[in-house]
């Protein structure tokens, strides 16, 4: 892209991170895997202070990254959707999981994150990173629920000792 094209580029609305995945398990089982920290720790974060409950702050921890955040469920509609607020990259954002039965005991899970703030470059990075993170989470969920396999996708995304910037230099 030339500098002229770059200079004329602008966002017309704040972007939203969005991804989805078909999981070959019934809605109740897929929903439970997101709501219940004892299951979610098998494919996403490594520790949690408890099960999601509306209005109750919960701490999620990714020990491999020395990161923990507080999330608060804003809505839980059993087997339909979970909405949480969490710190986001530049301020609080809203994450929503929706669960739709597809037939034959399968579920389509959709995840969105909205409410990002920042300039255009920051917004594009935040949305790309968030979309990637939730895609890895859903792939890990799929592998765990369908096959009983822990892929460790979230943990392996940023392994210690690997500098991505060094890998992309020519």
Where does each model-flagged region fall?
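Hydrophobic pocket/interface hotspot
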Residues: 30-34, 40, 58, 73, ...
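Glycine-rich portal/gate segments that line the openings of hydrophobic small-molecule binding cavities
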Residues: 41-42, 47-88, 170
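Hydrophobic/aromatic beta-strand elements that line small-molecule binding cavities or substrate pockets
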Residues: 21, 70-75, 94-101
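Hydrophobic ligand-binding cavity/cleft-lining segments
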Residues: 1-49, 168-170
């Amino acid at each position: 892209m030339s500098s002229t094209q770059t200079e004329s580029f602008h966002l017309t609305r704040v972007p939203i991170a969005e991804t989805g995945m078909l999981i070959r398990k019934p809605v109740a089982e897929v929903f439970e895997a997101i709501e219940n920290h004892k299951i979610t720790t098998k494919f996403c974060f490594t520790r949690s202070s408890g099960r999601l409950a509306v209005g109750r702050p919960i701490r999620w921890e990714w020990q491999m990254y020395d990161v923990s955040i507080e999330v608060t469920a804003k809505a839980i509609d059993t087997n339909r959707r979970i909405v949480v607020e969490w710190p986001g990259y530049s301020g609080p954002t809203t994450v929503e999981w929706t669960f739709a039965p597809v037939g034959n005991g399968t579920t389509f899970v959709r995840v969105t994150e909205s409410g990002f703030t920042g300039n255009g470059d920051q917004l594009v990075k935040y949305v790309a990173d968030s979309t990637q993170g939730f895609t890895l989470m859903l792939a890990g969920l799929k592998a765990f629920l369908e096959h009983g396999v822990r892929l460790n996708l979230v943990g392996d995304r940023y392994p210690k000792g690997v500098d991505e910037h060094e890998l992309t230099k020519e």
